[in-house]
């Protein structure tokens, strides 16, 4: 949700008193302008003060022009409302915080203020007290620049009616029709209040009704709880992921010092909640049904290697949900560039927490695998030193493992995905290779053999493709056989040729030259040779 700075600009209504010495041309410009309401407005034009509105319209237009220049954000969101107060006409100018940090806001606003004096008031500063001011977190000295969220608009600005409400401008799509339409304003306010009520009810439902634990109830705590809940839903555990998911949201929390301090705490709390209450399927399975899965890269890789994508998808889904008992591991086997790492990497990066097996360090190979949602074993080998722990982890059993510079820690049942082009069921012990653990290891795995090389422009599997594939698997589940080799299927057999397609067999050309004489001639020649031999 974007954050906004609020600048309150007072608008002169008594030109002689508020702008002493202003030129006649300025007075004529203000007096000559006539305003009309758009056709979809239900406001009363007679309740609108047109002369101050002319000045206000020029002020907001020039202010936004300068704001876009200093913020370097031409698409920055804004909402401006012109109101008639008890003492003065004034504008509430809400501008998105994007591009302007709080520490330099005062400097930029001073520049904009001088521009408005020169361009609009011909160098004459209004005598209105504090006519150009940014809203602070508290009155008096020491308050920081206040950042409000979008809820400020339906909470405070939209409920205003005539004659207090004079005019409004915005580039926010959801409020365009409500600027000058009182009925639409009421509808949006009611919709917002309903949403707030539902959110509060949902927060109450999420709390343990049998718990008597004290809960701080305030706007600050509600906003913090909303932030942590959003981070958990999106699986965000770092500031980098937050920026990639919603840059405006991240910047809005950096705009003020009080909200900036919540960032690391919220990420830390969200991570703890995810590790304790969420599992891999919560992030691997997408929310929306998939209509066409044929363009999905995981689907293409499996189909290219002769697997039935629906059956293979059911294997992946059951693996993620730990449905197959001790057969807790998927082994993607094959040479380079066949997509095995492409699939495993995408699955691992889709969940908030994944661990990698460091098989090169035999002392602490599973150091990174504690409290993870998925374990990824990339291009490794099975050694006699780690095979017993590996069998427990691959089989989804609880096992304690040594950790570097720490005491041993327990690895809970966690889905494992292995990518390798070597035999992971052969145990290497020094210079020898043994197969005594082959059957137990095979009983813990589903093996996919990927042998078809991918084109150079095939591309990387994305997180969304992973979620779509698992969602499609959930909607098309089939029965899976508990076998080491995942059966292939879906390949089309070439039909037998018909009689019309069968041609006469070609004559085979002999490669050895045949003698030119017949058998009879050969016998006569042998007789002549025998007779000549006797005569000698």
From Swiss-Prot:
Protein name: Protein Rep68
Binding-site residues, ATP: 334-341
Class of enzymatic activity (EC top level): hydrolase
Intracellular or extracellular location(s): Host nucleus
Start-end of Polar residues biased regions: 196-211
Domain SF3 helicase: 308-463
Residue interval(s) of motif RCR-3: 156-160
SUPFAM superfamilies in the record: Origin of replication-binding domain, RBD-like, P-loop containing nucleoside triphosphate hydrolases
Span of the annotated motif RCR-2: 90-92
EC number annotated for this UniProt entry: 3.6.4.12
InterPro entries on file: Helicase_SF3_DNA-vir, NS1-Nuc, P-loop_NTPase, Parvovirus_NS1_helicase, PV_NS1-NUC
GO cellular component: host cell nucleus
GO molecular function: ATP binding; ATP hydrolysis activity; DNA binding; endonuclease activity; metal ion binding
Main location: host cell
Species this chain originates from: Adeno-associated virus 2 (isolate Srivastava/1982) (AAV-2)
One GO term (biological process): symbiont-mediated arrest of host cell cycle during G2/M transition
Function: Plays an essential role in the initiation of viral DNA synthesis. Binds specifically to an inverted terminal repeat element (ITR) on the 3' and 5' ends of the viral DNA, where it cleaves a site specifically to generate a priming site for initiation of the synthesis of a complementary strand. Also plays a role as transcriptional regulator, DNA helicase and as key factor in site-specific integration of the viral genome. Inhibits the host cell cycle G1/S and G2/M transitions. These arrests may provide essential cellular factors for viral DNA replication.
Cofactor: a divalent metal cation
Region (Disordered): 196-216, 488-536
Assembly and interaction partners: Interacts with host TOPORS. Interacts with host KCTD5.
Domain (PV NS1-Nuc): residue spans on this chain: 1-199
Record key words, sorted: ATP-binding, Covalent protein-DNA linkage, DNA replication, DNA-binding, Endonuclease, G1/S host cell cycle checkpoint dysregulation by virus, Host G2/M cell cycle arrest by virus, Host nucleus, Host-virus interaction, Hydrolase, Metal-binding, Modulation of host cell cycle by virus, Nuclease, Nucleotide-binding, Viral penetration into host cytoplasm, Viral penetration via permeabilization of host membrane, Virus entry into host cell
